């Protein structure tokens, strides 16, 4: 039996072979990135580099695929690797348990990737990722803000220059223009951010000024849309 038989019917032998031979790096394995990895693995992508320095916490359970009571405290990169190999034992998976940013960018060979997915939260890390991807000539798709939103139908995939509404998109648009970056593909939402109804008591992660509210059905849809775009680009 072929685990990917139904996908093969849709994509054909040529498409499946392209996915099997593809190497995709996913930076950030949270609410969005976890679903990106899941869909890529189930689509038959043959090699995945999974990058995240964080561990699963109890507050991740409401929205993150990798977060279960049984995985709390486990490295997200390791949890993702185990899950991918349970889906496709033949996949080549590298778990990078480290924070990606300007200081660690040189540790990654971007010329070895066929596609890069940015599901990182911080602007400096996102810009460092775009910088290295552009230098290597490797396609990249960046996820912008998915927090403080309730309507997953408002997501769009487009060029950074065509974004609107999203506060993170505004910052990234300005920074990309300043650096002369063109043709940066992003996922963003046209939904106006929803103000939090309560003040968070969680400790702020590094580089974050506040914690957005979140629900399971928004970042998951973003991740699946991104994975779909990556697959379509890879088989073209």
Spans of model-derived segments:
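Conserved N-terminal Rossmann-fold NAD(P)-binding element of oxidoreductases
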Residues: 26-28, 51
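Conserved SAM/SAH-binding loop
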Residues: 97-105
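Conserved S-adenosyl-L-methionine
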Residues: 41-47, 135
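Hydrophobic/small residue at the entry helix of a nucleotide-binding pocket
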Residues: 32-33
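Glycine-rich phosphate/adenylate-binding loop
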Residues: 20, 108-113, 120-128, 135, ...
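Glycine-rich phosphate-binding loop and adjoining beta1-alpha1-beta2 segment
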Residues: 45, 50-88
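N-terminal charged helix/coil linker that caps or initiates catalytic domains
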Residues: 1-25
